Regions:
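Basic, Lys/Arg-enriched alpha-helical interface segments
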Residues: 1-58
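Extended aliphatic helical segments
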Residues: 4, 13, 41, 64, ...
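Basic/aromatic recognition patch in beta-strand/loop cores that engages polyanionic ligands
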Residues: 47-80
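Enriched for short, Lys/Arg-rich terminal
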Residues: 71-101
Length: 101
């Protein structure tokens, strides 16, 4: 089993989207968003190599997996430490170039 760490940047994006979801669509929607995130974290604990490893604009050291419509977890697998590091959450409708720098 792998340990999943969540970066402050990813946590901040998750918090922002959950607040926005609650404001626009209600608390139940925000809770479903957080549940979807937790489900993917559970998958990563058990099967860390899931997700896509080759996207055109994402550096090859990262893998990505979708967890909510338009929201992707960007993560690295550190097999030597049995650890997964969720680095960022991107919205595929927006320019995520700041993550690539």
């Amino acid at each position: 089993m792998y340990k999943v760490d969540i970066s402050p940047a990813a946590n901040s994006v998750l918090e922002e989207y959950s607040f926005r979801c609650a404001k626009d669509n209600g608390t139940a929607c925000a809770l479903r968003l957080l549940d979807a995130f937790d489900d993917k974290v559970s998958y990563l604990e058990n099967t860390p190599l899931i997700g896509c490893a080759r996207l055109k604009y994402i550096p090859s050291k990262y893998r990505v997996i979708t967890f909510w419509p338009h929201l992707w977890l960007v993560f690295q697998v550190k097999e030597e430490d049995n650890r997964v590091k969720i680095e960022y959450i991107i919205d595929d409708r927006q320019n995520y170039g700041s993550f690539l720098r």
